[in-house]
Amino acid sequence: MTDAGTVNGENENKQEGMIFEILKKTAESGAAARLGRLRLPRRTPIDTPNYIATSSRGVIPHITPDNLAKHARFGAAYLALEDFIEKKNPAVLSIPSPDKRPLHTFTCLPESIATVLATRRNPAIKTPVGNGAKFVAIFTSTGFANITTEEYASTVEKLRPDIAIGPADLFHTSSMPPSKKLVRMAERTEEWTDVFLSPKRQQAFREAGVSVFAPVLAVPYQIQWEHLSHLANDVVDSISGLAVYNVDLIPDIEDNYAPLVPLPRLSLHIPDTPLAILRQISLGVDVCSVPFLNTVSDSGVALTFTFPPKAGSGIQPLGTDMWLPEHETAVAPLMEGCGCYACTTHHRAFVHHLLNAKEMLGWTLLQIHNHQVVSDFFAGVRATLRDGGGDGFEALSEEFAKTYEPELPLGTGTRPRARGYHFKGEANPSRINPPAWERFSGDEADAASDAGAVARRADAEGTETPVLPDVGSLKLQEKGFAEVAADEAKPAQ
């Protein structure tokens, strides 16, 4: 077991503002879980291992800033630049900021929560074309666009996030592209890193209080070893951490690049389940991104897992589907022993009613609860690493795998109305939302045919079903539009 005195000797960050210290490591050498603390100016220190919340369009879905300040237990939020630059002069670049942190002011995040800015969402929506030699393809709220490394660096300098993730040439359509493409991805990322961290930019970032995390691509080590060597030998003095897109590369970093070992590791390798999070922690990840939280809340599922796992008979589910009829009269909390606002103030029957009534509060309570469950999960991991060390953590991880089902439950009800960021950018996608309007027709067969035609046309155009009918008023009048049937007419007074 290694303590902070031996690991953190050269670990204080070279850039002003951010400090990361390793308090304990579960193995003397090689990839292993580690206990640490990340400090950012004017933000609440983040004890690691921990997680960052995933935002959408600059907000944590379903939770308003005032409720974040009251109930949030996470220390940072992941933001995507493509969410804010939908037009030539975006509002985010012109907003006055009293504390000289425009991104924080624009998103109205609580003062305690740090901002982590990257070019693309995580996970990102596929673009029609891949990245170019000097630009990253992005998906804004008004369509697809390109942003160059210089433009991204200039925007970071203006927005002043607490942490900025360097530009990376990520997978476009295939997760296993040809080796020539992988080599080009590594070379581009190295070139973009040099442009992003030019001497002039380094000074500007330092004065703005921006800490830069360099990307580690999700390509084999044999292909990007030169990029990693460049980071370790030439760029390490200019970066504050690593943004890892494939945690399986961490053992190679530990074994071959000592200058990169003390840096904090932010995992952008998307975990599908809590068990995948435990594996990332065991490899040495300090901060995880957990996008499935938003998906689970949207589906109407309340998470119920803990770490260490609770003793029980049989395999337990990772969550509870709050749409099920069995919750109609249940006055129990969403999870026994949970101290979140939803569990201490309301009960299952109330949340079940809200979901069925399509009340926004239902998803808000689920989101607050689910973030609390994940916060408690990471707190349990830290306590285990602190008290039980690596052996205790591995033993409880195996027990967790035996106690809970391998997959998260799927909600059986209707999710909130899908927005643009829910779409994946795939060819010929099926409609997520049912059509809200249909063309009027006296004949049921004609009505069904007309409605289908409208929906197909909307699919082709990529728009919502039109509110206005496509026929004139005379045609509608011939079909009896707005007429009251004789037997339903209002009786004479």
Which residues are covered by each model-predicted region?
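Short acidic/polar active-site loop segments enriched in Thr and Asp
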Residues: 75, 162, 237-240, 286, ...
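Conserved, mostly hydrophobic/aromatic
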Residues: 44, 156, 214, 280, ...
